[in-house]
C-alpha cells in the first residue's frame, strides 16, 4: 500500500488490456503465406478433424489460422488474408483465414451467410 505522499508524487498506473491478436500489430487483417496446411483434433468433448494452416505473416510472425467452411483449396505457399478470431475448441488457434480473397476460394454451394465465406450469389 503506497503512502499519500507516494501517490502525490507518482499516482496510480492504469492496467493495460492484453491484446488478443498481437501478430496483426493493430491491423484488422494481415497477408501471409501458408507454410503448412494440416488437420487437427479439437478439445474434449468435441470430435472432428479441423482444418488449420500455419501462416507466416507480413509482420514476420508465424501463426496458426483456422480455415472456415466446407472444403478448401489451400496448400503450401498459398497467399492468404488472416483476421483475428479464436476457435474455442482448438488451443492456440487465435486467427482465421478470410475465404474468397487472394488465393483462397469461397465455399462452393453456400446459400446462407455467404459474405462470411466469400461465396457469390448463385444464378437462379
From Swiss-Prot:
Modified residues (3-methylthioaspartic acid): 89
Record field: compositional bias (Basic residues): 108-118
BP-aspect Gene Ontology terms: translation
UniProt keywords, alphabetically: Methylation, Ribonucleoprotein, Ribosomal protein, RNA-binding, rRNA-binding, tRNA-binding
Cleavable signal peptide: none
Similarity comment: Belongs to the universal ribosomal protein uS12 family.
CDD domains: Ribosomal_S12
Function (record text): With S4 and S5 plays an important role in translational accuracy.
A GO term for molecular function: structural constituent of ribosome
Residue ranges, annotated region (Disordered): 1-32, 104-124
Name the UniProt record assigns to this protein: Small ribosomal subunit protein uS12
One GO CC term, this protein: small ribosomal subunit
Pfam family of the protein (one): Ribosom_S12_S23
Keyword rRNA-binding on entry: yes
Domain of life according to the entry: Bacteria
InterPro entries the record matches: NA-bd_OB-fold, Ribosomal_uS12, Ribosomal_uS12_bac
Amino acid at each position: 500500500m503506497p503512502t499519500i505522499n507516494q501517490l502525490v508524487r507518482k499516482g496510480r498506473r492504469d492496467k493495460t488490456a492484453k491484446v488478443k491478436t498481437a501478430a496483426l500489430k493493430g491491423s484488422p487483417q494481415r497477408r501471409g503465406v501458408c507454410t503448412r496446411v494440416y488437420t487437427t483434433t479439437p478439445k474434449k468433448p468435441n470430435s472432428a478433424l479441423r482444418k488449420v494452416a500455419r501462416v507466416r505473416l507480413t509482420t514476420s510472425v508465424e501463426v496458426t489460422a483456422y480455415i472456415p467452411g466446407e472444403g478448401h483449396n489451400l496448400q503450401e505457399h498459398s497467399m492468404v488474408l488472416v483476421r483475428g478470431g479464436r476457435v474455442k475448441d482448438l488451443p492456440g488457434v487465435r486467427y482465421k483465414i478470410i475465404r474468397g480473397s487472394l488465393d483462397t476460394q469461397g465455399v462452393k454451394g453456400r446459400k446462407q451467410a455467404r459474405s462470411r465465406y466469400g461465396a457469390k450469389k448463385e444464378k437462379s
